Amino acid sequence: MHDITLYGHMTVDRIFDGFEEKQTLGAMANMWRTFKHIAPDLDIGMCPTSIGEAIVYIDRDSSTRYSNFVPDIKTNTPIIKQSKISHAMYINKLLDVSWLKELTGVISADVCAGPRVDSSLLQHIDYFFIADEDAYADLKTMCKDTKGHVILHTNKSSVVSDGRYETNYKIDDSMFAPKSNVLGAGDMFASSFLYGLHLGLQIEEIQEYAHDTTSKLIRTEN
């Protein structure tokens, strides 16, 4: 049994950091890389269902990134693996989500910029990650759609709610890295959050750990 298994998109990223170009792997690879940084011995399963390509521009002055994403050059139906935590990436971009209800263990998912997520999928999700700019409704509505918790996050804060209770966390200004390469920051945050969940931490502790770890990783990679 794996500790955490990743499903969904893996991409070949062509990145322009200003005018400097490099190529790397993204999406699922971002989470894998984060796990290897924070917990090298964690047993990570990987089941890409879509392989695509992306062009990414990083604007350090505003700490933002812009991308054009062709997600489904190759697709495959995953073989579901036994796992303590199963995470589905970018479910608003997946062509086939029929396997989502078959995932094992604690089930989490996230979305990326693009079409609105099909809210009927969220009935299968224990932890749903969505960035503030991608929110399709208010937090209360998204919680009603989701089986478990919604993690609504920005680059400086997050709210975790199950519709009854919510916990809020905001990083200290000193932890924010200005003019930084924020590529993959959302994936770093989700990975760190899931690792905290794997450790059995309380939600408040997980939020603090996830934000702190993401900030440190961004500083390390810049």
Specify the residue positions occupied by each region the protein language model found.
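Glycine-rich phosphate/adenosyl-contacting loop at the front of the ribokinase-like
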Residues: 1-46, 179
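Short active-site-adjacent structural elements
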Residues: 14-15, 158-161, 190, 218
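Ribokinase/PfkB-type carbohydrate-kinase core domain
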Residues: 2-6, 36, 43, 54-169, ...
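Active-site glycine-centered loops adjacent to acidic/histidine catalytic or metal-binding residues
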Residues: 9, 131, 186
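Conserved post-catalytic alpha-helical subdomain immediately downstream of the catalytic base
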Residues: 24, 29, 41, 149, ...
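General alpha-helical segment detector with a strong preference for membrane-spanning helices
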Residues: 13, 114, 135, 190-191
